[in-house]
């Protein structure tokens, strides 16, 4: 089965697992997914993740979700740039999520980073998703 939007699939798995109160969730592994998870961990939205190998030899990422007093830390997780409609923004046009309370994750020539890091590095790129 082919997957048209692997990053969107990972975000949906995280949303669904948090709605069910799960402590961890697994998703197929890729570099882009790992880079996005690095940003989520640095911003404090997840506890962390580790790469595991299944019995079939496939690599998966096991994500440890974060809760505060029983409620998920991630309230809103949305894909912005989709395979059918890519969204790009310059350093000055990067969107602010909830007046700066949330984070946009951006794929730049210098790597995947948060909107604040991209603004300070003065680089723009593809706006992958927003987190609040």
Curated annotation (Swiss-Prot):
Keyword Nucleotide-binding: no
Annotated GO MF terms: rRNA binding; structural constituent of ribosome
Pfam families reported in the protein's UniProt record: Ribosomal_S8 (PF00410)
GO biological process terms on file: translation
One GO CC annotation: ribonucleoprotein complex
InterPro entries referenced in this protein's UniProt entry, alphabetically: Ribosomal_uS8, Ribosomal_uS8_CS, Ribosomal_uS8_sf
Record note on quaternary structure: Part of the 30S ribosomal subunit. Contacts proteins S5 and S12.
Family listed: Belongs to the universal ribosomal protein uS8 family.
Function: One of the primary rRNA binding proteins, it binds directly to 16S rRNA central domain where it helps coordinate assembly of the platform of the 30S subunit.
Name of the protein in its database record: Small ribosomal subunit protein uS8
């Amino acid at each position: 089965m082919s997957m048209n939007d692997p990053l969107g699939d990972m975000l949906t798995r995280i949303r669904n697992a948090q709605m069910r109160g799960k402590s961890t969730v697994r998703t197929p592994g890729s570099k882009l997914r790992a880079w996005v998870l690095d940003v989520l961990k640095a911003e404090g939205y997840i506890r962390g993740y580790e790469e595991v190998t299944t019995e079939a030899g496939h690599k998966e990422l096991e994500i440890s979700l974060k809760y505060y007093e029983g409620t998920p830390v991630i309230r809103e997780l949305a894909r912005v740039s989709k395979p059918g409609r890519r969204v790009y923004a310059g350093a000055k046009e990067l969107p602010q999520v909830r007046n700066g309370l949330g984070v946009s994750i951006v794929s730049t020539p210098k790597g995947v980073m948060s909107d604040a890091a991209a603004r300070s590095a003065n680089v723009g790129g593809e706006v992958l998703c927003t987190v609040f």
